[in-house]
From Swiss-Prot:
The keyword Chloroplast does not apply. This is Small ribosomal subunit protein uS15. It comes from Methanosarcina barkeri (strain Fusaro / DSM 804). The gene is rps15. HAMAP family: Ribosomal_uS15_A. The lineage of its organism: Archaea, Methanobacteriati, Methanobacteriota, Stenosarchaea group, Methanomicrobia. PROSITE patterns: RIBOSOMAL_S15.
């Protein structure tokens, strides 16, 4: 798949095997995966890192195969998932980092462009989440208040 703001192609990766049930060598249960997921989330670990930890440390090939739910669904059912989706949060944190860098290095034109592209991605993602009714219609990204939104 192509990248958004360049002419280059993205990284290719291997496809995961198609499975409908967990493998027989996986001995961990659904309740245990749920408790591990909630414990890791309380420690401040992202959902992608939770999946990698489950895979590497506990031998869980896919949390959805064992529990029947995605990691974000498990977190939403236990009312611990934040209101702003994680990919949008990561982009906002990146934009805040770039703004902080540009406040010190005012002539850095390459990172000015990077900030412009990042904020374009944020606006595009906000529009998508508003259409999908994940975010309310009156929610919008404002760089001045973005840091307060993320720390909440």
């Amino acid at each position: 798949m192509a990248k958004m703001h360049t002419k280059r192609k993205g990284k290719s990766s291997s496809t995961r095997p198609i499975r409908t049930e967990p493998p027989e060598w996986c001995k961990i249960g659904a309740e245990e995966v749920t408790t591990i997921t909630l414990d890791l989330w309380k420690q401040g670990v992202s959902t992608a890192e939770i999946g990698m930890t489950l895979r590497d440390r506990y031998g869980v090939p896919d949390a959805k195969l064992i529990t029947g739910k995605k990691i974000t669904t498990i977190l939403k059912e236990n009312n611990v998932y934040p209101n702003v989706p994680e990919d949008l949060t990561n982009l906002i944190v990146k934009a805040l980092r770039l703004r902080k860098h540009l406040s010190v290095n005012k002539k850095d034109v390459h990172n000015k462009r990077a900030l412009n592209l990042t904020e374009s991605k944020i606006r595009r993602l906000v529009k998508y989440y508003q259409q999908e009714k994940v975010l309310p219609r009156d929610w919008f990204y404002k760089p001045e208040t973005a840091e307060m939104m993320i720390t909440r």
